[in-house]
């Protein structure tokens, strides 16, 4: 009997689409939130409704869609789609999540990043949470800090949900907002670059707010390769990802042979078909200086060989020297020791120097670190997007209503005080 009920449930709630859909493979309604249940979540997590208003019930779908892999073959990817129950047309908001090395991704009310999408959705945004290639229920291997595949996870998911909207009677108002935190900052900014290059009239970027991302890969972020760093996992993640994407070491058949023992045999457990091991698990096993796990000849090549393909490809994935058309706000905190805050400053200053005018630099705190900065970056992003949502592409108004800004500052001061008293910045030195 239970098996029959399960089959009926899957048939009712999971819809496999047919040939008229070019990108959408399937969609499943996984959860429905009422305003009451969202209010209870906000109360549990001490989220002020004046900062994130609760205005609409929200349906949450898991979406499977088609995307092109690096060799131009088609693979499937996944994502979460947050749909407010409203009749009027609404803007898209796409959120790029932070770094993960494990494939598994659940739909969970306890996930803070998914909560951001729920918060936008209940306030009238149609929110997308694309899994990067190889994460969630998607095929392929995740390519860390790889601009093209990050961006394409955004692009193809948007194509897919545009097809889905016709089935669930949802309309977009023509606005598209892009944001994300940490790797998601890099991913959302890469998505803007590619959306604007594709120039599809259906999906014009309205504004972007990348948060605490590593945009200057061969500049500010590169320095961490050679010094004590709280997240040393990033270097082998980059090397193994870029070997797949670009074959940066063409004479190396097994990329793991470039790592010193025991990492040559340890790393595959984290980067190959890893369902649940986190980068925090890996960091506990690594030396504090990232380059110390790589064989010396490779470090020497990076430092002295100007033709070294790995460094060239890192430079290609910098996001500092191009001209975005839609307005951009960089959010960051100067206390960030995981993603050097100067990434944002370098991107801003470089773009200003080449004539970009619709660009803003927003330092949220001189003290908060990478983790504690996130909530305030999200607040600033929400305030920034709300201007455009309410007033159109060129809003002539102050960024934030005074009372909201005052409340956000009160919350920030409390967090900074708690952070200072803890004498802990999540770094492992």
What positions do the PLM features span?
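Catalytic-loop region of hydrolases
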Residues: 19-88
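Short, surface-exposed "cap/lid" segments of acyl-processing enzymes
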Residues: 70-78, 84-119, 137
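Alpha/beta-hydrolase active-site loop
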Residues: 144-166
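Short alpha-helix in the alpha/beta-hydrolase fold that links the catalytic acid
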Residues: 191, 326-327, 340-351
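Accessory cap/linker subdomain of secreted extracellular hydrolases
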Residues: 211-321
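C-terminal catalytic histidine-bearing segment of alpha/beta-hydrolase fold enzymes
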Residues: 222, 306-313, 338, 345-346, ...
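Short beta-strand/loop motif that positions the catalytic acidic residue
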Residues: 329-336
């Amino acid at each position: 009997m239970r098996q029959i009920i399960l089959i009926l449930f899957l048939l009712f709630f999971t819809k496999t689409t047919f040939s008229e859909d070019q990108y959408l493979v399937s969609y499943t309604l996984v959860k429905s939130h009422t305003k009451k249940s969202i209010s209870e979540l906000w109360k549990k997590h001490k989220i002020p409704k004046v900062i994130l208003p609760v205005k609409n019930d929200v349906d949450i779908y898991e979406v499977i869609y088609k995307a092109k892999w690096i060799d131009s073959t088609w693979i499937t990817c996944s994502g979460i789609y947050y749909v407010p129950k409203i009749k009027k047309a609404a803007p898209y908001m796409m959120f790029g999540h932070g770094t993960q090395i494990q494939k598994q991704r659940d739909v969970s009310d306890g996930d803070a990043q998914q909560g951001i999408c729920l918060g936008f959705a209940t306030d009238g945004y149609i929110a997308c949470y694309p899994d990067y290639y190889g994460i969630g229920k998607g095929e392929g291997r995740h390519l860390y800090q790889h601009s093209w595949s990050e961006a394409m996870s955004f692009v193809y998911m948007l194509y897919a949900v545009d097809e889905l909207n016709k089935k669930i009677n949802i309309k977009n108002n023509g606005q598209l907002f892009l944001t994300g935190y940490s790797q998601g900052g890099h991913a959302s900014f890469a998505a803007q670059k590619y959306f604007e290059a594709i120039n599809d009239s259906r999906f014009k970027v309205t504004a972007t707010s990348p948060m605490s991302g590593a945009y200057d890969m061969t500049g500010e972020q590169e320095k961490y390769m050679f010094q004590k760093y709280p997240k040393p996992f990033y270097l082998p993640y980059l090397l193994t990802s870029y070997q797949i994407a670009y074959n940066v070491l063409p004479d190396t058949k097994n990329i793991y042979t470039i790592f010193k023992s025991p990492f040559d045999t340890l790393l595959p457990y984290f980067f190959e078909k890893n369902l649940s091991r986190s980068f925090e698990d890996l960091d506990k096993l690594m030396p504090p200086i990232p380059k110390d796990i790589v064989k010396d000849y490779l470090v020497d090549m990076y430092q002295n060989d100007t033709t070294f393909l790995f460094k060239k490809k890192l430079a290609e994935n910098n996001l500092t020297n191009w001209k975005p058309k839609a307005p951009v706000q960089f959010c960051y905190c100067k206390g960030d020791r995981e993603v050097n805050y100067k990434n944002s400053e370098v991107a801003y200053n470089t773009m200003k120097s080449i004539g970009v005018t619709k660009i803003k630099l927003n330092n949220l705190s001189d003290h908060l670190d990478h983790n504690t900065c996130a909530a305030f970056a999200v607040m600033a992003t929400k305030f920034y997007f709300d201007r455009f949502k309410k007033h159109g592409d060129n809003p002539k108004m102050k960024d934030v209503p005074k009372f909201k800004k005052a409340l956000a500052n009160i919350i920030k001061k409390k967090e900074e005080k708690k952070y200072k008293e803890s004498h802990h910045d999540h770094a492992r030195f």
